[in-house]
Amino acid sequence: MERTLENLDHGWWIVSHEQKLWLPKAELPYGRAADFGLTGEKALQIGLWEDAPVWLVLQKREKDMASVRQLIDQDAGLFQLAGRGVQLAEFYRSHKYCGYCGHEMHPSKTEWAMLCGHCRERYYPQIAPCIIVAIRRDDKILLAQHTRHRNGVYTVLAGFVEVGETLEQAVAREVMEESNIRIKNLRYVTSQPWPFPQSLMTAFTADYDSGEIQIDTKELIDAGWYRYDQLPLLPAPGTVARRLIEDTVARCRADDE
């Protein structure tokens, strides 16, 4: 899967180091390897975008290294490929040596994995499953400001799935821990790879069942029920959180007409 780049190799270039990628002109570079000084570098093709290959190069550039968040408002498919590249780059960087025997490892030629030639151990990229849920109560939606969101954004509740827990159990637990609310009528909506750092967001909607809001101050700054036409500052378009909010708001509005 890995190859040495030649002058005329072309496509989209994910040049990544330590969970950042190279974004000259604030966008993912497209063109020939020679155009970006990549001739002779090792690269992996990790997908196709608009019929052109997407290449991953493990390299740090002196400037224009930025978070993949800068691509979040672009096409979802391109953002997903960029996220894959950043996650794979970090996986290869952090798995140079075997955790069991300490010997140097090498990439598999057939799958996204690192192999130890000494003890034959095989490592795969770690993915952290998360849940995210929009909760409706009549014509209102539960929105919260998280401690990590200091910009005033309100969003839906989310959290990591714990060991030995189903997705449904994780939703109920996270909602209760963060807001003291019980839910019912849980429904799966969609999923979204989320490279911050290596998550897979699993999105649900649910209805309010019982309880009064009591926030976990370690996780939330504020939370409340917001009528569909009186919403606070929301997450950016392109995020699964924004989709959940918009879907819930649309149902509230339709039922109110």
From Swiss-Prot:
Q: Which UniProt keywords apply?
A: Hydrolase, Magnesium, Manganese, Metal-binding, NAD, Zinc
- The residues listed in the UniProt record as binding a divalent metal cation 1, with positions renumbered to this chain, are 158, 178, 219
Q: Which residues bind a divalent metal cation 3?
A: 174, 178, 219
Binding residue positions for Zn(2+):
98, 101, 116, 119
Intrachain S-S bonds: none
GO molecular function (one): magnesium ion binding
| UniProt keyword Manganese present | yes
Q: Name one Pfam family in it.
A: Zn_ribbon_NUD
The UniProt entry's GO CC annotations, sorted and at most eight, read: cytosol
EC main class here is hydrolase
Report the cofactor remark.
Divalent metal cations. Mg(2+) or Mn(2+).
Keyword Zinc tagged? yes
Q: Name one GO biological process term.
A: NAD catabolic process
Residues that bind a divalent metal cation 2: 174
Q: Which domain of life is it from?
A: Bacteria
Its needed co-factors are: Mg(2+); Mn(2+); Zn(2+)
Which intervals of this chain are the motif Nudix box?
159-180
> Hey, which family's this protein in?
Belongs to the Nudix hydrolase family. NudC subfamily.
What does the annotation say about its assembly with partners?
Homodimer.
Role of this protein: mRNA decapping enzyme that specifically removes the nicotinamide adenine dinucleotide (NAD) cap from a subset of mRNAs by hydrolyzing the diphosphate linkage to produce nicotinamide mononucleotide (NMN) and 5' monophosphate mRNA. The NAD-cap is present at the 5'-end of some mRNAs and stabilizes RNA against 5'-processing. Has preference for mRNAs with a 5'-end purine. Catalyzes the hydrolysis of a broad range of dinucleotide pyrophosphates.
Record's protein name: NAD-capped RNA hydrolase NudC
Q: Which organism is it from?
A: Cronobacter sakazakii (strain ATCC BAA-894)
